[in-house]
Amino acid sequence: MDIWLLCWVTLCLLAAGHSEPGVSQTPRHKVTNMGQEVILRCDPSSGHMFVHWYRQNLRQEMKLLISFQYQNIAVDSGMPKERFTAERPNGTSSTLKIHPAEPRDSAVYLYSSG
């Protein structure tokens, strides 16, 4: 029996770090089909210099994907560059894009700023 393979990517964006409210995250949860583009966006509190994207796969430790200092990349050693891109063009909001989504991308994606 032929069944189309679906990629269920659950993406949770959690704010961590600074104690002041004001971090906007969209979407908080995301389920997508295999091959689709996933765009995660986070807007930190005003004045935050650093932003960090993390990924935690099931039963594994959390791993840093990329860090920005304002719009410049500070660390990107954990970023799988073949299908993942991240940017912080204006030094405030940041996006993480996955394209095309694959089953191995199923994880919790976290964002922090400070």
From Swiss-Prot:
One of its GO terms (cellular component) is T cell receptor complex. Keywords: Adaptive immunity, Cell membrane, Glycoprotein, Immunity, Immunoglobulin domain, Membrane, Receptor, Signal, T cell receptor. The keyword Signal applies. Coiled coil: none annotated. The keyword Signal applies. GO terms for biological process: adaptive immune response; cell surface receptor signaling pathway. Gene3D superfamilies: Immunoglobulins. Residues 21-114 form the Ig-like domain. Residues 1-19 form the signal peptide. It is found in: Cell membrane. Glycans are attached at N90. InterPro entries: Ig-like_dom, Ig-like_dom_sf, Ig-like_fold, Ig_V-set, TCR_beta_variable. Probable non-functional open reading frame (ORF) of V region of the variable domain of T cell receptor (TR) beta chain. Non-functional ORF generally cannot participate in the synthesis of a productive T cell receptor (TR) chain due to altered V-(D)-J or switch recombination and/or splicing site (at mRNA level) and/or conserved amino acid change (protein level). Alpha-beta T cell receptors are antigen specific receptors which are essential to the immune response and are present on the cell surface of T lymphocytes. Most probably, the alpha-beta TR is not assembled due to incorrect folding of the beta chain. Alpha-beta TR is a heterodimer composed of an alpha and beta chain; disulfide-linked. The alpha-beta TR is associated with the transmembrane signaling CD3 coreceptor proteins to form the TR-CD3 (TcR or TCR). The assembly of alpha-beta TR heterodimers with CD3 occurs in the endoplasmic reticulum where a single alpha-beta TR heterodimer associates with one CD3D-CD3E heterodimer, one CD3G-CD3E heterodimer and one CD247 homodimer forming a stable octameric structure. This is Probable non-functional T cell receptor beta variable 17. The gene is TRBV17.
